[in-house]
């Protein structure tokens, strides 16, 4: 159990909330917020998760309004025993933040292996671009494990849209769903 949680993957997904005001209070969900992803606006919550790289199991779940940026939640998703942390480009600069965890409990420095944006790769000379793309592909293939958890929650459990109002209820529901997803993922053959 000593090697568990040494290599972590952090990621988040948007859980939509009904934006309709056709209810008794004529109001939208007060804790849900809007966010633009690509060219599409979403209204709802964000589920931030920390996943063990080797087992693919979720160890930390944090739920916020959708407008909370990924990098803000990085330190809350880490256990303190990490040696390396993988994340998408939303976590760029996580190691430079004031609240970032730079050393684990053993005193070793934590390596943040965050995917770069494609525009950052194109800025380099063409000879170096091939090597950088290969490195980014390796990071992405490791990071893909977290998407399996989201596939179970959103696909198998069909929890793409919230059924409750309020952050407390969303947190309770998503904690339960990710725990159930862990049971499903732990039961699959390797």
Residue ranges and their predicted role:
Residues 3-102, 115, 175-181:
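Polybasic low-complexity intrinsically disordered regions
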Residues 15, 151-154, 184:
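Amphipathic alpha-helical core segments of compact helical bundles
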Residues 18, 30, 118, 125-126, ...:
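Proline-rich intrinsically disordered, low-complexity coils
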Residues 57, 157-162, 182-190:
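Short helix-capping/linker segments at secondary-structure and domain boundaries
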Residues 83-84, 89-168, 172:
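Helix-centered, glycine/charged polyanion-binding patches within enzymatic domains
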Residues 168-190:
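Charge-patterned, long linear interaction tracts outside catalytic cores
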